[in-house]
Curated annotation (Swiss-Prot):
The lineage of its organism: Eukaryota, Fungi, Dikarya, Ascomycota, Pezizomycotina. GO terms for biological process: terpenoid biosynthetic process; transsulfuration. Keywords: Dioxygenase, Hydroxylation, Iron, Lyase, Metal-binding, Multifunctional enzyme, Oxidoreductase, Pyridoxal phosphate. Disulfide bonds: none annotated. This is Bifunctional enzyme flvA.
């Protein structure tokens, strides 16, 4: 890729040189005509030009191989010194600074990553564009007295129209360059006109088609064309729009001939989940040799197969229709630089005057300053990039398809070679199996899961519209076609070495998404005919009796596992629960933990546990919580389906509900103890310690959690010292807010430590206070982590509660849950 960018930069330098040459000619012409010039403005131009030259030379150094530095730099200096006509006085001393390059090469960037190369080129391109239009006018003068009103000397006494909306000479040069790059063929002597966007291109074509057709004429479109193109066509009351029944050429031809269509619109590759394709080559061969087609128009949107077809050479025969081709050039043709909106229309030469006039009248031209931002590519660079993108997309498709068939259908049009295209684009689509998984709100969560997985894999990825970028991009796309659902669209990046990592990130993300999006609700009622269920009930009754007596009970994970299985927890969910803490969100208040929170409703009246809508979490000093954020509502990332629909988590809540049911505790102020039901805030927390960060499970020191019944469950740890995470239960007399290390030993009622998976501690929160020791590292060179579940269960709030809020008792809209209670 560095070779490609060195070639582009070489042409970029030629364009800079052309700007300097234009400036020299402009200045010479002004002198010849006796025109006044503003030296202050010119000094700004020259300062910026000097800056551009210097930055370009530095960028070129960063792109060079490690050998040959001095020779190449000396060549740069020679070229810079070659500027003349008075420029030497302004740039005096610049060559001296450049000459310092070969003695200070260590100060230059080495091994630039692709995103850095693109970012720096963008910056240089913007500066060059500014210089190119610095003195130019939108409406340059033909002649003048005393002051100049042009920059490009070709405008002086020009026979054409000096008006930027009519396309400047620079725009016409770019049009020719782009036509040569696309290699669309030579039949009908095609010409290219640049437009301000892809939709501007379609607008111009649509107006031309409407001008050529009569009231009541029919237009046939393939079963799908891009929705923003189809909608304005359908709204034309003077025309009848008919969709062909199939994407095969024969179906499209049959529809056109049956309806006597005057125009046919085709998308060779469609923006649909199936990436439906049309064999344009076969279509062209059939119609060009078929009577009645010479008077028809064929309009082709090649955006997704940019420059991939010898289109005009395929339309070769005695009955060849007029072919108009267009693209959104915001996509592939800009090499992923994303600098401007752009589009173009290609047409037979004899249609140029009519199309050009429409462009002028509608103001859809690509103006000169924007045209100068298009990268100076050629067919070699473009074909190399498109080939690389397609190869990467095919590889990603194979990797995803092999591992995700039970979750989704992954699509890429591998048959592009059969159509004699040069490439197959870089788009891969994903359609999930299962009801509801392809709804937009759910797919947005899928994108979030994939991005978080990409962060964990350390690979670059972007969520956003469009395609053809160097960095892999994901997006929830919508074809707006026959009531079809949205789908996940992946625009695969250009760096081949990243594809396997990208695949791992995408697979990890969609696995999390599928786990979280498919509701799984534990049903204790199905266990009533299993003897193990009643053995578990007897064990829990013993624990419940101890809890009612002692107000605290520690349940070892080894004891809990068969209990939870007897309640219906699935075997595979035990392992999954130990992994869920890898995917938590950032804590908004402290830097030593990641977290998720969800609100659940223990409905003892209807004997069910439900998920409720998110609400902010607040603890106050009045509830024995004394910290810097006491009384402040905290907005935590939400618990997702990967935890909520884990049957072990659901069984833990059922077990807690069974043990705490009808165990009276010291009431808290302004909670509704007349209600038989409880709210349970569930937290999934990872506390970590690493360099300069000490993980504090209870930064607030000795405290209470504003609950009636608190349960803490251990999920796992890494690199944690044996004196970490020790829980102390303190007498109510202990001072709230003091560190655990300062607590009075005589007021410590109990000491527990979670050591093994699912070790759980349940205590009456308002009858004691508690604190924990910090998380310490066993190996100080590595991060230490401690993963926990926290269940804070209380009665609903009443007006006057110290938090200043009451509970919003609403079921969750996108993550419903209804787990039966057996009590």
């Amino acid at each position: 890729m560095h070779d490609v960018w060195r070639t582009i930069l070489s042409r970029f330098k030629q364009n800079t040189n052309a700007i300097k040459t234009r400036f020299d000619k402009y200045r010479a012409l002004c002198k010849e005509l006796g025109l006044q010039r503003d030296e202050w403005s010119e000094s700004i131009f020259l300062d910026d030009l000097e800056k551009l030259l210097k930055l370009t030379a530095k960028f070129e150094m960063a792109l060079m191989p490690s050998n040959g530095v001095d020779t190449h730099v000396n060549g740069v200096i020679t070229k810079i010194n070659g500027f003349n006509n008075g420029f030497d006085t302004h740039i005096n001393g610049f060559d001296t600074r450049i000459n310092g390059f070969h003695t200070h090469t260590n100060g230059f960037d080495r091994g630039l990553e692709l995103w850095q190369i693109e970012e720096r080129y963008r910056a240089l391109a913007q500066l060059q564009s500014t210089l190119g239009s610095f003195f130019e006018r939108a409406c340059p003068g033909y002649d003048q007295s005393k002051i100049p009103w042009f920059f490009d000397p070709s405008y002086y006494q020009c026979q054409g129209v000096n008006y930027d909306r009519f396309a400047s000479p620079d725009v016409r040069d770019r049009e020719q360059q782009l036509l040569e790059t696309l290699q669309l063929g030579s039949n009908q002597n095609p010409k290219l006109l640049l437009m301000s966007s892809g939709m501007a291109s379609f607008t111009v074509i649509q107006q031309y088609v409407v001008q050529q057709l009569n009231y009541g004429d029919t237009v046939v479109v393939s079963p799908y064309i891009y929705f923003e193109s189809f909608q304005p066509m359908r709204s034309q009351k003077s025309l009848t729009v008919v969709n062909a029944k199939g994407f095969d050429p024969e179906s499209i031809i049959e529809a056109a001939e049956r309806n006597n269509a005057r125009a046919v619109f085709l998308d060779p590759m469609c923006n649909t989940v199936g990436l439906d394709t049309i064999d344009i080559r076969r279509f062209a061969h059939l119609v060009a040799n078929r009577g009645g087609w010479a008077d028809r128009l064929v309009i082709v949107d090649g955006t997704l197969v940019s420059g991939g077809m010898q289109l005009y050479d395929w339309f070769d025969g005695p009955h060849c229709p007029k072919v108009l081709y267009y693209e959104s050039a915001h996509k592939y043709i800009q090499l992923g630089l994303d600098l401007i909106m752009c589009g173009y229309v290609v047409m037979p030469e004899d249609l140029v005057p009519a199309i050009q006039l429409i462009r002028q009248i509608t103001g859809t031209v690509l103006y000169s300053r924007n045209a100068s931002l298009l990268p100076p590519i050629d067919k070699t660079i473009f074909n190399f990039r498109m080939s690389r993108l397609t190869t990467n997309a095919e590889k990603l498709h194979r990797l995803l398809d092999a591992e995700s068939r039970n979750m989704a259908e992954v699509t890429f049009p591998h048959h592009w070679r059969d159509y004699r295209w040069r490439h197959g684009g870089n788009v891969v689509t994903v359609r999930f199996h299962g009801e509801g998984l392809n709804k937009r709100s759910n797919l947005e969560r899928c994108c979030d899961d994939i991005l978080r997985a990409a962060e964990e894999e350390g690979v670059q990825m972007v969520k956003g519209a469009s395609l053809g970028f160097s960095t892999t991009r994901i997006f929830v796309a919508d074809a707006f076609f026959e009531n079809t659902d949205p789908f996940l669209r992946i625009s695969v990046g250009v760096q081949s070495e990243d594809i396997e990592t990208v695949a791992r990130a995408v697979l990890s993300g969609i696995k999390r998404y599928c786990m979280s999006a498919v509701p799984v609700n534990l049903d204790v009622g199905q266990r009533l005919y299993d003897a193990k269920f009643y053995i578990a009930m007897a064990s829990m009754l013993e624990v419940r009796a101890r809890y009612a007596k002692d107000r605290v009970v520690f349940m070892e994970g080894e004891w809990l596992v068969p209990i939870l299985k007897a309640l219906g927890a699935r075997e595979e969910d035990f392992d999954a629960l130990q992994q869920v803490s890898h995917h938590l969100g950032k804590d908004p208040t402290v830097d030593y933990r990641t977290i998720r929170n969800g609100l659940f409703y223990f409905n003892f009246e209807n004997k069910a546990i439900q998920r409720f809508q998110k609400q902010r979490f607040t603890l106050t000093v009045q509830e024995n919580y004394k910290r810097h954020d006491s009384g402040l509502p905290r907005d935590f990332p939400e618990v997702r389906g990967d935890l909520q629909y884990n049957t072990v988590l659901q069984a833990l809540m059922v077990a807690k509900a069974f043990i705490m049911n009808k165990v009276d505790v010291e009431p808290r102020a302004h909670l509704d103890y007349s209600s038989p039901n409880f709210l349970c805030n569930v937290f999934n927390i990872r506390t970590f310690t690493e360099k300069n960060i000490l993980g504090e499970p209870t930064l607030e020191g000795v405290h209470a959690d504003g609950a009636d019944h608190t349960m803490t469950t251990f999920l796992g740890c890494t690199n944690m010292r044996s004196d970490s995470g020790i829980t102390f239960i303190h007498d109510q007399k202990e001072i709230t807010g003091i560190p655990a290390t300062e607590a009075q030993p005589s007021l410590i009622k109990h000491r527990f430590q979670h050591r093994h998976f699912l070790d759980s501690l349940l205590f009456a929160d308002n009858e004691a206070k508690h604190s924990l020791t910090s998380v310490f590292q066993e190996d100080v060179s590595k991060r230490a982590t401690r993963d926990m579940l926290l269940f804070l269960t209380r009665k609903p709030k009443l007006a006057g509660h110290s938090s200043g809020s009451v509970d919003a008792m609403e079921p969750h809209k996108t993550l419903p849950m209804n787990v039966p209670l057996w009590l």
